[in-house]
Amino acid sequence: MTILYDEGQQAIATESRRVLEARTSTEALLPLLESVGEYHRPFWDTAKEQGWTALALPEAHDGLGLGLIELGLIAHQAGRSLSGAPFLTSGFGAAKAIELYGSDAQKARWLSALASGDSIGAIAFAAGPDTLPAQPDVTFTDDRLSGTARGVSGGLAGNVAIVLANGPGMPVLALVDLTGVERTPVPSFDNSRCVANLTFADATAETLAVGTTAHDAALHIL
């Protein structure tokens, strides 16, 4: 399928490519692939400065109110330049989950912070090789999370995570502040992805969605 970009979208692609070519280099990025636990902070600072972290978030929460096409154009250029940072997991995955399923209080707490790039979001859905498990490894009971979410991209850098958990008789999509959560670095082929195991020990969490809605929400975000 051919996608025809309008003039504004073409300008986003051209300008983001120009900026990234000027501010990134292979020499600067290669060490990040081998160093566990660090993402490309110059790229993240650039994303904040250029408003890319706010691109697809609603204007009511300090976003730019654009869509997935524009976000995809930036992500394409970031990938082209090998910029390593949790760009899509934060600016789309976590942010979109809160925008679509969060309460007014949850939106007020997190969306502006994600739009500014001052907070980073992570997505914790997988269990082993299963990207969207029927029985997640993490359990949700009485607004508490227990268990370990493994291989979470952006987990080392994140301030907030959206977790697919096993609730009482049904799946739960939960929001958790990662302050105080144990994080174990996981070496990967690209260590700038800041992959970590997140261990929850009765961590306070908030509900975003339950039952089939939780499953459908997770599928939509993926």
Name each model-derived stretch.
Residues 17, 45, 72-76, 95-99, ...:
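Predominant activation on well-ordered alpha-helical scaffold segments within soluble catalytic domains
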Residues 85-104:
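N-terminal glycine-rich flavin-associated loop
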Residues 112-222:
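FAD-binding core of flavoproteins
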Residues 26, 55-57, 88-91, 122-124, ...:
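Short beta-strands and strand-loop turn motifs
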Residues 1-85:
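Amphipathic, small/basic residue-rich leader segments at the start of a protein or domain
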Residues 19-23, 97, 121:
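Short alpha-helical functional segments enriched in proximate histidine and acidic residues
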Residues 81-82, 101-121:
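FAD-binding glycine-rich core of flavoenzymes that anchor FAD
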Residues 27-28, 100-106, 169-170:
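Short helix-capping/linker segments at secondary-structure and domain boundaries
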